[in-house]
């Protein structure tokens, strides 16, 4: 992820979307054994591929049209890197890489877009979902931090933390 981002993603963002740099983060998070560092030269699984995530804030900061332009630019990045091929990005989802709204990512992962959960909600989140939400390798953090990029912005009920 880091090599692919440094070679292709970072230049694309800096050249085509410099105005977004203060607001977006890039990283390698979510589901999949490679997110946890388990895929290596011997044990790569069926969906091992080069790529990274571009996290966007809400539409009040990055509108739909700009997000769409960013999705198209990501889709145009090279399909092969170091002998590995990227999966096709479907407009209806399916890829774990690409442009993702932070609120949508955390809604899928833990059930709340902002991380404000009751004690009961925290206890009901499956372990794998929590792991996917917090096991991150951020390649670039936004200059203007907003939840959920700042870990302590998540409200963990005092009875649990």
For the regions a language model picked out, list residue spans one by one.
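N-terminal regions immediately upstream of nucleotidyltransferase
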Residues: 1-11
């Amino acid at each position: 992820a880091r090599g692919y981002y440094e070679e292709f993603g970072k230049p694309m963002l800096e050249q085509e979307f410099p105005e977004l740099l203060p607001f977006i983060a890039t990283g390698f998070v979510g589901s999949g054994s490679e997110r946890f560092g388990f895929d290596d030269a011997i044990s790569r699984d069926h969906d091992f591929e080069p790529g990274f995530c571009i996290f966007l804030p809400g539409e009040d900061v990055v509108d739909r049209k700009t997000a769409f332009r960013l999705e198209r630019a990501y889709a145009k990045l090279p399909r092969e890197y170091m002998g590995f091929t990227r999966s096709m990005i479907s407009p209806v989802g399916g890829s774990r890489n690409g442009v993702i709204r932070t609120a949508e990512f955390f809604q899928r992962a833990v059930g709340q877009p902002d991380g404000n959960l009751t004690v009961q909600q925290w206890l009901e989140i499956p372990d794998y979902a929590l792991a996917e939400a917090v096991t991150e390798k951020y390649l670039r953090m936004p200059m203007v931090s907003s939840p959920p990029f700042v870990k302590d912005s998540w409200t963990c009920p005092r009875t649990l933390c």
